[in-house]
UniProtKB/Swiss-Prot annotation:
It is found in: Cell inner membrane. The gene is dctA. Belongs to the dicarboxylate/amino acid:cation symporter (DAACS) (TC 2.A.23) family. Gene3D superfamilies: Sodium:dicarboxylate symporter. InterPro entries: C4_dicarb_transport, Na-dicarboxylate_symporter, Na-dicarboxylate_symporter_CS, Na:dicarbo_symporter_sf. It comes from Rhodopseudomonas palustris (strain ATCC BAA-98 / CGA009). This is C4-dicarboxylate transport protein. NCBIfam families: PRK01663.1.
Length: 445
């Protein structure tokens, strides 16, 4: 019987080979953002050139192009290594129930904080509706029935061509079950899919080298278009989002962790290396393989980790959920649009659906935001251009919250299944773990 397969991520740094600070991606991105602010402030005419704007838009598109193959490979791999089909269904139901409850807490928290601290008031922005038209086209309004039917693709090729995550996810689940049913005959194809995932993560590593260019273009264009005065409100939104995400991790995830029997801060320390990878890439998927390996070493069931973590990257994005409701309120405040209690309930209900299509890759949360705004009030959609400039700042914390949330989810579902090794959990969280001990590898037994 084969052991669980895990996929190397090329972003994992080797110990003992410290880069010069100017070669660190996060430093480069911060430098690019500062330069973008200066260019937008000192030369607004140049900064609003369509080619400058295209730098930011192009980077987001580069990231989005690899979302579908990543989701397919990780979900198929997770399911294909489980031998009991009934267990897949049982674990899946428990995971989805957990995802829905915790995601709802994140969405509600964003609404509460956004109402208590209306940092968008006074911005009085009047953005161009065409600035974000391409995002709106990908997130058109649909009814609940349309949403369910939309999950079923007209063709598998079409699902991948359009990059529709929920359609790809459905096919991946079915394909994983079919591969699992093949038994030994399916092992060769399963290994091919694992190898394909290696290549996709390699593409991400290449694309992320362009992150500073994308950040420069997005920031320069926004400051050039709206002026440096917009920074005050935007910084307020960033600070509020940081604080809300931290509150969620400590209050909600911390409570869940305590219920299971571990300390959330020790858990964060345990996955600190994965968090640093995420911080440098602003993509929670860049650390997915390492996270899965560490969760198994922590005492979680291999089969639970293989199913819960990849699925959580579409269904359990806590940071993205907080961002969606908080950003929606900020945009409404900035545009001077009053949202009634009924409107905000609608935001919550719509976001509970649209958030399930978000992926843990940079830019996906922004597209999902378009779907929420278009469904609640189309007049809010042009305001997305306001927050796009600072999306890089918020993307970092979104990704950090997402990966922490998915890690806690795997531990909780393993505990719920009665397959959590509490002795290993306590032992690993009570000591520092060398990153070299958790190098991921493809293993077969």
């Amino acid at each position: 019987m084969s052991a669980t397969t895990h996929i190397d991520a090329p972003a994992l740094p080797k110990r003992g080979k410290s880069k010069p600070f100017y070669k660190v991606l996060y430093v480069q991105v911060l430098f690019a953002i500062v330069v973008g602010v200066l260019v937008g402030w000192l030369s607004p005419h140049f900064a609003t050139n369509e080619w400058i704007k295209a730098l930011g838009d192009g980077f987001v598109k580069l990231i989005k192009m690899v979302i579908a193959p990543i989701i397919f490979c990780t979900v198929v791999s997770g399911i294909a290594h489980i031998q009991d089909a009934r267990k897949v269904g049982r674990v899946g139901i428990k995971a989805l129930l957990y995802f829905e409850v915790v995601s709802s807490f994140a969405l509600v928290l964003g609404l509460i904080v956004g109402n208590l601290f209306p940092v968008g008031h006074g911005l009085a922005a009047k953005p161009d509706a065409g600035a974000v038209a391409k995002y709106v086209d990908q997130a058109s309004h649909m009814s609940a029935v349309d949403f369910v039917l939309h999950i079923i693709p007209d063709s598998v090729v079409g699902a991948f061509a359009k990059g529709d995550i929920l359609q790809v996810l459905l096919f991946a689940v079915l394909f994983g079950f079919a591969l699992m049913a093949l038994g030994e005959r399916g092992h060769r194809l399963r290994d091919v899919i694992d190898d394909a995932a290696h290549a996709v993560f390699g593409v991400i590593a290449i694309v992320m080298k362009a992150a500073p260019i994308g950040a420069f273009g997005a920031m320069a264009f926004t400051i050039g278009k709206y002026g440096p005065a917009a920074l005050g409100n935007l910084i307020g939104l960033v600070a509020l989002f940081y604080a809300t995400s931290a509150l969620f991790v400590v209050l909600v995830l911390g409570t869940i962790a305590k219920f299971v029997g571990f300390n959330i801060f020790k858990f964060i320390g345990y996955i600190k290396d994965e968090l640093l990878i995420v911080l440098g890439t602003s993509s929670s998927e860049s650390a997915l393989p390492q996270l899965m390996e560490k969760l198994e070493r922590l005492g979680c069931s291999k089969s639970v980790v293989g199913l819960v973590v990849p699925t959580g990257y579409s269904f359990n994005l806590d940071g993205t959920n907080i961002y969606m409701t908080l950003a929606t309120l900020f945009i409404a405040q900035a545009l001077g649009i009053e949202l009634s209690f009924g409107d905000q309930v609608a935001i919550l209900l719509v976001a509970m659906l649209t958030s399930k299509g978000a992926s843990g890759v940079t830019g996906a949360g922004f597209v999902t935001l378009a779907g929420t705004l278009a469904a609640v009030n189309p007049a809010l959609v042009p305001g997305m251009a306001i927050v796009f400039s600072i999306d890089k700042f918020m993307s970092e914390v979104r990704a950090l919250t997402n990966i922490t949330g998915n890690g806690v989810a795997a531990v909780f579902v393993s505990w719920w299944e009665g397959e959590l090794d509490h002795d290993r959990l306590r032992a690993n969280l009570s000591r520092n773990v060398d990153p070299s001990d958790v190098e991921t590898a493809v293993t077969t037994g």
